[in-house]
A protein has these predicted regions:
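N-terminal signal-anchor transmembrane segment
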Residues: 1-63, 79-91, 376-378, 393
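Long extracytoplasmic/lumenal interhelical loops at the membrane interface
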Residues: 151-161, 274-335
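Aromatic-anchored transmembrane helix interface
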Residues: 72-84, 93-116, 126, 130-135, ...
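Hydrophobic transmembrane alpha-helices and their immediate junctions
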Residues: 61-64, 126-129, 189, 314, ...
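Membrane-interface helix-loop-helix junctions at transmembrane boundaries of multi-pass membrane enzymes
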Residues: 12-21, 59-74, 182-193, 226-235, ...
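A membrane-periplasm/extracellular boundary helix in multi-pass inner-membrane enzymes
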Residues: 204-205, 225-274, 293-298
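Alpha-helical transmembrane segments of multi-pass inner-membrane proteins
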Residues: 125-151, 163-227, 374
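Transmembrane alpha-helices of multi-pass inner-membrane enzymes
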Residues: 28, 52-55, 368-380, 385-422
């Protein structure tokens, strides 16, 4: 079994835990591989399949008498099948469709493996710590790669691997929120150091979306945590800290150069004069969203076909490799209203179950992932995540939080095939 405690990663070996240890190593390797070798073909596919194979070893080791199929696996399989079938009415048949399909199959493998691994609350706690550890390694790798003189220039997160800094910063935000949960709900004071480190990384990444989430996440978590003593004092304290973070970003020269000026330009773009000279990326993202809306209007029910947003933009507007920067409009333009309803149906189910666990059963873990899911929906107005691997790992962990609180584990969350008993 792999554990991360007091800043030390430990591997405890025993005959009973061999399969579990193999899976936990595969989980960490997969996260690091997707970051460090983002541009290497098929390596992400390999590590995703290894996660599934390792979870199968774990399932066999449990000597389970029933075949269990997680609901979130059925959901994403249905969404993947519908996405693939969109080739029948697609505006263009292109290589991107095959690439998207392969990526989505790997996502199915990864999210299924997580549902197999997480069988009780202790498993969920452990996988959260493994995720935090993985992001810590990624952050340290990036800091070690970038000279100190370059830190304030933004884009922290893209230097080591060439990955999109927005995407990396989003994943680090997830780890920051998990670390804040360990600090605030479980009283593990050392985790506040990780919260601070992750927040600094996000500031230096120049990602406005991740910065918003990294500040709003702890605030929302405290607001929802009505079970805590000194509730109103905690609200005042977290809002004060959030205000100080924003003040620091807007007044410190290095922080302002890294992200403060981008925040200022965004506010100018939203609330003042759009003709004023601001960050050109804001204009382009608004333009791409408008194009996605036009495509949806042309084919509202079925969409233009998986991967066709970029292809149509390339053929019609000669803009290569673009996306809408909005998960809602990306899905609506490519897969129509049917694809949109299939995809977000699981979000709805997860949020409802987490809300029930958080407010009725008083589960702090459910409160954590309810906060994450709410912010994910908000952030997807500026991110495209429906076929991204790492965000779906966190969504799968959030789904796992909906069933581990039950005394009998998966009784209510799984479809059971009893044919093996016959």
């Amino acid at each position: 079994m792999v554990s991360f405690k007091n800043g030390v990663l430990k591997i405890q070996r025993s005959e009973d835990n061999t399969a579990r240890t193999i899976y936990e190593i595969c989980f960490v390797v997969n996260a690091l591989t997707l970051f460090a070798f983002n541009d290497v073909k098929f390596i992400g596919t390999l590590t995703g399949i290894l996660m599934l194979l390792a979870s199968m070893l774990l399932w066999i080791g449990r000597r389970a008498e029933k075949v269990t199929i997680p609901y979130n696996t059925i959901w994403y399989m249905l969404f993947t099948a519908y996405s693939a079938s969109s080739g029948l009415w697609s505006s263009y048949i292109n290589a991107d469709m095959a690439s998207y399909f392969l990526r989505m199959v790997v996502i199915i493998a990864m999210i299924t493996s997580i549902s197999i691994y997480v069988d009780k609350p202790e498993d969920l706690e452990r996988i959260i710590k493994l995720y935090i550890f993985s992001m810590l390694v990624i952050v340290l790798m990036e800091f070690a790669t970038v000279p100190i003189s370059e830190w304030s220039k933004g884009s922290m997160g893209s230097h080591f691997s060439g990955s999109n800094s927005n995407g990396v910063a989003f994943l680090v935000f997830c780890a920051e929120l998990m670390a804040f949960y360990e600090f605030y709900s479980k009283g593990k004071k050392r985790y506040i150091l990780l919260v601070a480190l992750f927040l600094v990384f996000i500031i230096l990444s120049s990602s406005r979306k991740a910065l918003f989430a990294s500040v709003a996440g702890p605030v929302l978590f405290v607001l929802l945590s009505t079970y805590k003593k000194n509730y109103f004092f905690n609200i005042v304290a977290i809002l004060t800290i959030a205000a100080l973070v924003v003040f620091f970003i807007m007044t410190d020269e290095n922080a302002y150069n890294a992200i403060g000026k981008r925040v200022a330009s965004m506010l100018t773009f939203w609330f003042e004069d759009r003709d004023h000279e601001v960050d050109n990326s804001l204009y382009m993202r608004s333009y791409y969203i408008e194009l996605a809306k036009r495509m949806f209007a042309e084919s509202p029910l079925l969409g233009k076909g998986m991967g066709n947003f970029a292809k149509i933009i390339d053929n019609v507007y000669m803009l290569d490799g673009v996306y809408s920067h909005n998960n809602f409009w990306q899905i609506l333009s490519e897969l129509g209203l049917i694809g949109f309803l299939i995809y977000y149906s699981m979000y709805f189910v997860i949020i409802i179950r987490l809300a029930k666990g958080a407010f009725i059963n008083k589960s702090r873990m459910n409160m954590l992932f309810l906060t994450f899911m709410i912010l994910l929906v908000v952030l997807e107005t500026g991110l495209v995540t429906y076929n991204s691997k790492m965000p779906h790992i966190v969504i799968a962990i959030a789904y796992a939080a909906t069933y581990v609180g039950e005394m009998d584990g998966r009784k209510y969350q799984y479809i059971e095939n009893n044919s093996l008993d016959e």
